[in-house]
Regions:
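Metallocofactor- and cofactor-centric catalytic cores in central/energy metabolism, strongly enriched
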Residues: 25-28, 37, 41-47, 67, ...
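ADP-ribose/adenylate-binding Rossmann-like module
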Residues: 42-97, 102
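Glycine-rich phosphate/diphosphate-binding loop of Rossmann-like nucleotide-binding domains
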Residues: 1-44
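Glycine-rich beta-alpha junction loops
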Residues: 7-10, 28-29, 47, 76-78, ...
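Adenosine-phosphate binding glycine-rich loop
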Residues: 76, 80-143
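Predominant activation on well-ordered alpha-helical scaffold segments within soluble catalytic domains
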Residues: 11-15, 40, 59, 63, ...
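Short, well-ordered secondary-structure micro-motifs
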Residues: 14, 36, 55, 83-85, ...
Length: 143
């Protein structure tokens, strides 16, 4: 497993939580190229704050992947993480092959696994709500 992000602090936290054995890196072109070339599965889950600072995985990187490898775009409903998936519509098939690489791009994938999504949301929101309760108000929590 290799995790890429543009925020070094997030990458450090991921390593602290999951262990030093996990490979993390920023979006360095050479490192990405080597990772894509050897990957069996690539999952795109990048969240965009605004469209000016979008990072989209180029078609050239997808072309370097092994035949039969799989790309899963979890952000296709927000515009997609990959050039090869970003122009899909609801009528397009969820699974298709491009450049010998399988692509799974289903709008609202999290709706397909409602229980897992609910647990993930609980892991995010329960600590926030507990902190809010301890602080007494949103303003108190912000301070």
């Amino acid at each position: 497993v290799k995790v890429f992000d543009d925020d070094i602090n997030k990458l450090r936290i991921i390593q602290q939580v999951l262990g030093q054995g996990l490979f993390t890196s920023t979006f360095h072109p050479n490192v990405l190229h080597n990772a894509f070339r050897s990957a069996d599965v690539v999952i795109g889950a990048m969240r965009y704050i605004n469209t000016r600072h979008r990072y989209i995985i180029a078609t050239d990187l997808v072309r370097t992947m092994k035949k039969g490898a799989l790309v899963i775009d979890l952000r296709v409903s927000q515009g997609g993480c990959f050039e090869t998936t970003c122009c899909l519509s609801r009528e397009d098939p969820a699974v298709f092959e491009q450049y010998g690489v399988l692509h799974y791009c289903k709008l609202n994938i999290s709706n397909r696994v409602a229980r897992t999504t609910s647990m993930a949301y609980s892991n995010i929101f329960v600590p926030l709500l507990l902190s809010l309760g301890d602080a007494g108000s949103v303003q108190g929590m912000i301070k």
